[in-house]
């Protein structure tokens, strides 16, 4: 089961989130049938989104949009405070690797663009914040967003590793943030540790990667686990929701769908679930719309 562990240094100067998102990203790959680079790009976005949502309370929802002008197109993800996330990538078929090493490439094919975060607190007035893409690798772009937009110095590591058949092997990451009151000596110590820590890929490949991430972040410093919560890919779409959307089209357009198309098929962008509305379904919707 996927999970996120929240922790804080005993000094109260640093907090860290570590995540195992393997099943989440695996489910996304299966639903969208993404190829290698698209899988990694979408997976990193889902992980970043789960970190941001874990910072919220109540019934808030956080949308992340990674908007590039190159191969991937847009990547859209939505997460809630209960650990659920859904998302999609416009171009599912990007499959580019380094010839010598087989490393899956993401950044060079993201292009120029923006990292957009929309936080919906349920008040009817969502808050939107935008920062430019720095490398297109998503992890670095997320860290830049946290530092520039939320004014919280942060270190981030996110990755998705694939097996020999390009299926998700493991996915996860971490976020480390400096809290008010941290001394210069503490900051220097943590900066040095982050600079010298093994690559996120090697940590994720270790036998117990959650513990490996925590050990790499805190070293010999004491820390306290604050919480452990489950994570999952979950889409809240339903036939009823799409029926409500059809109701907004108007009688004329609905009648055309019924008479000319003999029904309509709608596919959810976030999870690829398809819903079919028969002529009888459309007749009912038309009748409901004129009541």
From Swiss-Prot:
GO molecular function terms attached to this record: protein folding chaperone; unfolded protein binding
Pfam short name (any one): HSP33
Post-translational modifications: Under oxidizing conditions two disulfide bonds are formed involving the reactive cysteines. Under reducing conditions zinc is bound to the reactive cysteines and the protein is inactive.
CDD domains in the cross-refs: Hsp33
Record InterPro entries: Heat_shock_Hsp33, Heat_shock_Hsp33_C, Heat_shock_Hsp33_N
Any Gene Ontology CC annotation: cytoplasm
Signal peptide annotation: none
Biological process, per Gene Ontology: protein refolding
Cystine crosslinks: 235-237, 268-271
Domain of life: Bacteria
Keywords associated with the record: Chaperone, Cytoplasm, Disulfide bond, Redox-active center, Zinc
UniProt-annotated location(s): Cytoplasm
Role noted for this protein: Redox regulated molecular chaperone. Protects both thermally unfolding and oxidatively damaged proteins from irreversible aggregation. Plays an important role in the bacterial defense system toward oxidative stress.
Family that this chain belongs to: Belongs to the HSP33 family.
Protein name, per record: 33 kDa chaperonin
